[in-house]
Every structure is written in structure tokens, then in C-alpha cells.
Amino acid sequence: MPKPFDLTLYLVTDPRLVAARGLLTTVDAAVKGGATIVQLRDPDAHGRALVEQARALKALLAPLGIPLIINDRVDVAVAADADGVHLGQDDMTPADARAVLGPQRILGLSVGNPAEYAASDLSGVDYLGVGPVKATGTKADAGGAIGAAGVGAVRALTRLPLVGIGGLATADVADVIRAGADGVAVVSSICAASDPEQAARALKAAVLAAR
């Protein structure tokens, strides 16, 4: 079994949005503001560069007890000793990923709607990322927005922990949590914020207030 993890405020990094401030500076500020789990997502980075980024983030986050998740790349997660991997629908199957990762690492899966959930291989999956809740500009291949109601529809089908993701701002958090999400995953609301620490603090407060 993976170690316990907290999905309250799930930060997904975007290399373009953190370029000016720096990846480590942005993530450090977000964690100080209350981010509870961090996913490294950089689809354009080559393997070696991604491993280096992951190791730097692991060194930052491990002493704080914050899990580091790697988007898509099981090999990078193993090489950097990250805490887990998040898979999309077109990535390696969860069963194959689990076979490589072993039982201790966290495994997440993206789900776009109830039909996609029903068709998914959930072997070894520990949590779901459900969305996009709203239209998003940070992921070109994201499907159509499903709204908080879509999150609720997936929640009705599963007991797995889940986060709502996709275009979420602080004002959207309450609806997503009340629909049954355990937390929210955000990209630009923190990565593009002028003050990532304060942005994270406001988002986390909104999650806790809606529970």
C-alpha cells in the first residue's frame, strides 16, 4: 500500500508559467501556502532534464512530507525516487505502471466523464483526477468541460479519492468539493499567480470551508 497522501490542494506544474519565477521557487511558495501534493508535468522535457527536475523537487519536498508525483513518466519516477505517477487515458496502463512502480508508490489516473471511468483499467489506481471541470488552456488535449456536476457523476460511481481539475479558480472550489471531490488540482491558479503562496492559501481555505 502507498503511504497516506492528502489531495486537499494538488499543484500541477507548468514549465511555461513558472519559467520567470523558477520551478523550485514557485513550488516552495505553493507548499508554504498549503499545497499538499505536487505533480511535475513538463511534456516537452527530455528524460535526463526531467529526472534532474524531479530530483531537485524531491529534495525540496521530502523533508516537508509532501509527495511528488510525476506526470506520465514511470521511468522518471523510479529514477528520481518520486512518490508516484499520474497517468492519462493514453499512457501506459495502470496495471503495467503498477508492476514497475511496486506497491509503495502512489498511482493516479485522469478520467474525463462517467463513461471514461467505466471503461478504465483501475488496477492499482489510488486516486482519480476528474475533469476538465472548466475549459483550460494549460492542456491542449483536455476534453470538453464537465462542470462540477460531472465530478459528482464520477463520484457516484467510485469510492476512490478524487480531485477536480481544469480551469479552477478559488471561486469554483466550493462547488467541486460539494460535488464530492476530496480536493482540487490547479495549474495556472498558482503557477501564474503574482503571489503563489497567497494563491495556495486562498485555495486551500476554500476547500476546507466547503467540506
Curated annotation (Swiss-Prot):
<feature type="binding site">
    <location>
        <position position="139"/>
    </location>
    <ligand>
        <name>4-amino-2-methyl-5-(diphosphooxymethyl)pyrimidine</name>
    </ligand>
</feature>
<comment type="function">
    <text>Condenses 4-methyl-5-(beta-hydroxyethyl)thiazole monophosphate (THZ-P) and 2-methyl-4-amino-5-hydroxymethyl pyrimidine pyrophosphate (HMP-PP) to form thiamine monophosphate (TMP).</text>
</comment>
<feature type="binding site">
    <location>
        <begin position="136"/>
        <end position="138"/>
    </location>
    <ligand>
        <name>2-[(2R,5Z)-2-carboxy-4-methylthiazol-5(2H)-ylidene]ethyl phosphate</name>
    </ligand>
</feature>
<feature type="binding site">
    <location>
        <position position="110"/>
    </location>
    <ligand>
        <name>4-amino-2-methyl-5-(diphosphooxymethyl)pyrimidine</name>
    </ligand>
</feature>
<dbReference type="GO" id="GO:0005737">
    <property type="term" value="C:cytoplasm"/>
</dbReference>
<feature type="binding site">
    <location>
        <position position="72"/>
    </location>
    <ligand>
        <name>Mg(2+)</name>
    </ligand>
</feature>
<feature type="binding site">
    <location>
        <position position="91"/>
    </location>
    <ligand>
        <name>Mg(2+)</name>
    </ligand>
</feature>
<dbReference type="Pfam" id="PF02581">
    <property type="entry name" value="TMP-TENI"/>
</dbReference>
<dbReference type="GO" id="GO:0000287">
    <property type="term" value="F:magnesium ion binding"/>
</dbReference>
<keyword id="KW-0784">Thiamine biosynthesis</keyword>
<dbReference type="GO" id="GO:0009229">
    <property type="term" value="P:thiamine diphosphate biosynthetic process"/>
</dbReference>
<dbReference type="GO" id="GO:0009228">
    <property type="term" value="P:thiamine biosynthetic process"/>
</dbReference>
<feature type="binding site">
    <location>
        <begin position="187"/>
        <end position="188"/>
    </location>
    <ligand>
        <name>2-[(2R,5Z)-2-carboxy-4-methylthiazol-5(2H)-ylidene]ethyl phosphate</name>
    </ligand>
</feature>
<dbReference type="InterPro" id="IPR036206">
    <property type="entry name" value="ThiamineP_synth_sf"/>
</dbReference>
<keyword id="KW-0460">Magnesium</keyword>
<keyword id="KW-0479">Metal-binding</keyword>
<comment type="pathway">
    <text>Cofactor biosynthesis; thiamine diphosphate biosynthesis; thiamine phosphate from 4-amino-2-methyl-5-diphosphomethylpyrimidine and 4-methyl-5-(2-phosphoethyl)-thiazole: step 1/1.</text>
</comment>
<dbReference type="InterPro" id="IPR034291">
    <property type="entry name" value="TMP_synthase"/>
</dbReference>
<dbReference type="InterPro" id="IPR022998">
    <property type="entry name" value="ThiamineP_synth_TenI"/>
</dbReference>
<protein>
    <recommendedName>
        <fullName>Thiamine-phosphate synthase</fullName>
        <ecNumber>2.5.1.3</ecNumber>
    </recommendedName>
</protein>
<feature type="binding site">
    <location>
        <position position="71"/>
    </location>
    <ligand>
        <name>4-amino-2-methyl-5-(diphosphooxymethyl)pyrimidine</name>
    </ligand>
</feature>
<feature type="binding site">
    <location>
        <position position="167"/>
    </location>
    <ligand>
        <name>2-[(2R,5Z)-2-carboxy-4-methylthiazol-5(2H)-ylidene]ethyl phosphate</name>
    </ligand>
</feature>
<keyword id="KW-0808">Transferase</keyword>
<dbReference type="GO" id="GO:0004789">
    <property type="term" value="F:thiamine-phosphate diphosphorylase activity"/>
</dbReference>
<dbReference type="InterPro" id="IPR013785">
    <property type="entry name" value="Aldolase_TIM"/>
</dbReference>
<comment type="similarity">
    <text>Belongs to the thiamine-phosphate synthase family.</text>
</comment>
<feature type="binding site">
    <location>
        <begin position="39"/>
        <end position="41"/>
    </location>
    <ligand>
        <name>4-amino-2-methyl-5-(diphosphooxymethyl)pyrimidine</name>
    </ligand>
</feature>
